[in-house]
């Protein structure tokens, strides 16, 4: 069952859509996984969308999923084909990191209110993981402590060869690394799982692993999982488009959810 709610956003069209996907079977206090996309990302239940596909995998296991998409000027991503930079400027020109973070927090809170009858997990990819860490590790963050946080390709410092992206909207106002490091040290959650693709060209492995190491959790409550041959976005396996990275993520997550 699919439900859509629209929240007031901070920028552009002023809308933060949240799609809630409930499993066909299962009642009671089902776990909720709230998904946050990466910078300039698009997240929906549409077939072929990374977040929609992963949500369906978790749905089949009995979890409720909520997909949050942040506010922007336009939503016609397909118009720009592979020109990611043109898309970033057209859809997000003038948007700040703080605005994007506020959208993410609003989406998390609304999804938890609407569908969080069981344990609540926040799953953030790349920038979405940064939003999840800050929201759960800063005093003025979430109104609740999530049961668990899952990161996908999230670190506190990007590779030097990728620094050109820091001139793009949102990223050009991203806070210094020490803010994320402090949030990791003060993280309020019961469990932390981080996935990292061995072919990640955005974040060095050590900057992702350190966020897990810093979290104030027992060793058995935090995991850092390297998926061999997978890219930063978890869309390819050894250079070829593949859904396998998402299947690996879901296979790790399902036992933790239940």
Annotate each language-model stretch with its function.
Residues 48, 190, 204-214:
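Short alpha-helix in the alpha/beta-hydrolase fold that links the catalytic acid
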């Amino acid at each position: 069952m699919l439900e859509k709610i629209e929240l007031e956003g901070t920028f552009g069209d002023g809308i933060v859509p949240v799609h809630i996907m409930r499993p066909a079977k299962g009642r009671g206090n089902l776990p909720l996984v709230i998904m946050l996309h990466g910078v300039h990302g698009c997240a929906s239940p549409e077939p072929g969308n990374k977040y929609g596909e992963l949500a369906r995998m978790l749905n089949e296991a009995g979890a409720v999923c909520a997909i949050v998409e942040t506010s922007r000027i336009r939503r016609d991503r397909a118009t720009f084909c592979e020109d990611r930079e043109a898309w970033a400027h057209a859809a997000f020109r003038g948007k700040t990191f703080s605005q994007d973070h506020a959208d993410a927090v609003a989406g998390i809170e609304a999804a938890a209110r609407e569908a969080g009858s069981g344990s609540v997990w926040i799953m953030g990819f790349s920038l979405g993981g940064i939003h999840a860490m800050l929201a759960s590790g800063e005093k003025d963050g979430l109104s609740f402590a999530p049961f668990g946080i899952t990161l996908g390709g999230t670190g506190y410092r990007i590779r030097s060869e990728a620094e050109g992206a820091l001139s793009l909207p949102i990223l050009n106002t991203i806070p210094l690394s020490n803010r994320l490091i402090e949030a990791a040290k003060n993280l309020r959650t019961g469990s932390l799982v981080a996935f990292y693709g061995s072919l990640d060209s955005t974040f060095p492995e050590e900057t992702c692993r350190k966020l897990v190491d810093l979290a104030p959790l027992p060793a058995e409550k935090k995991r850092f999982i390297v998926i061999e041959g997978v890219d930063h976005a978890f869309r390819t396996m050894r250079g070829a488009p593949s859904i396998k990275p998402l299947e690996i993520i879901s296979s790790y997550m399902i036992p933790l959810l239940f």
